[in-house]
């Protein structure tokens, strides 16, 4: 498996988490929608499924790790940045085989692509604090 396959899986997972957060649809329906309506060439589909389902079903646990690190209530964090942070916290917590530097770098790149102008700085700061605590 190439690193780019995981990068594409993360990109798709962030979009799915974002869609799930806003729509309120169940996880299985959102996953099905993404697997049938998105371009999946070069995507590690199994990794996408794990990241999306893991982040979506463990949201409360992930949010508890995030809340003490934030400079504002979680509800005030943009939905895009929240999706990126949930994905990254899931990987940092449950995928110990992925180096933390890779997870943080991937999250920063996702924030540059999808987030607000300085969203990547916010994401980087939060994840750096999380790694320092563990």
UniProtKB/Swiss-Prot annotation:
Keywords: RNA-binding, Transcription, Transcription antitermination, Transcription regulation. GO terms for cellular component: cytosol. It holds the Pfam family NusB. It comes from the Bacteria. GO terms for biological process: DNA-templated transcription termination; transcription antitermination. InterPro entries: NusB-like_sf, NusB_fam, NusB_RsmB_TIM44. One of its GO terms (molecular function) is RNA binding. NCBIfam families: nusB. Involved in transcription antitermination. Required for transcription of ribosomal RNA (rRNA) genes. Binds specifically to the boxA antiterminator sequence of the ribosomal RNA (rrn) operons. Belongs to the NusB family. This is Transcription antitermination protein NusB. It comes from Shewanella amazonensis (strain ATCC BAA-1098 / SB2B). The gene is nusB.
């Amino acid at each position: 498996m190439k690193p780019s396959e995981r990068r594409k899986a993360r990109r798709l997972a962030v979009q799915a988490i974002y869609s799930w957060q806003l729509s309120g649809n169940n996880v299985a329906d959102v996953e099905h929608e993404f697997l049938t309506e998105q371009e999946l060439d070069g995507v590690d589909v199994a990794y996408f499924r794990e990241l999306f389902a893991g982040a979506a079903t463990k949201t409360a646990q992930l949010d508890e790790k995030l809340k003490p690190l934030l400079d504002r209530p979680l509800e005030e964090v943009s939905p895009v940045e929240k999706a990126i942070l949930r994905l990254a916290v899931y990987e940092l917590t449950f995928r110990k085989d992925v180096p933390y530097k890779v997870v943080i770098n991937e999250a920063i790149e996702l924030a540059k692509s999808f987030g607000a102008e300085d969203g990547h700085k916010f994401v980087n700061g939060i994840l750096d604090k999380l790694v320092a605590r563990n």
